[in-house]
């Protein structure tokens, strides 16, 4: 009879250690993918901004590199 409470306590302790459900793993993957996409968009915007600045500096120094 003393084993029953110990068994119940062990079950309660072991339940949080159960592996994550598939739904939780999918949600984590989607969040991680969204963050990766956000990083790529920021990087593209950053690179295009650098190219615009470089182009404007080039146009101020030498007009042969300008598209206008």
Swiss-Prot record:
Contains 2 disulfide bonds that can be either 'C1-C3, C2-C4' or 'C1-C4, C2-C3', since these disulfide connectivities have been observed for conotoxins with cysteine framework V (for examples, see AC P0DQQ7 and AC P81755). Its main location: secreted. Disulfide bonds: none annotated. Expressed by the venom duct. One of its GO terms (cellular component) is extracellular region. The keyword Signal applies. It is found in: Secreted. It comes from the Eukaryota. InterPro entries: T-conotoxin (IPR031565). Keywords: Disulfide bond, Secreted, Signal, Toxin. Residues 1-19 form the signal peptide. Residues 20-54 form a propeptide. Pfam families: Chi-conotoxin (PF16981). GO terms for molecular function: toxin activity. Belongs to the conotoxin T superfamily. The cysteine framework is V (CC-CC). This is Conotoxin Lp5.2. The lineage of its organism: Eukaryota, Metazoa, Spiralia, Lophotrochozoa, Mollusca.
């Amino acid at each position: 009879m003393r084993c029953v409470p110990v068994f119940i306590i062990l079950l309660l302790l072991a339940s949080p250690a159960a592996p994550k459900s598939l739904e939780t793993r999918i949600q984590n993957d989607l969040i991680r993918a969204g963050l990766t996409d956000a990083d790529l968009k920021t990087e593209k915007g950053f690179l295009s901004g650098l190219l615009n600045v470089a182009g404007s500096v080039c146009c101020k120094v030498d007009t042969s590199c300008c598209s206008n």
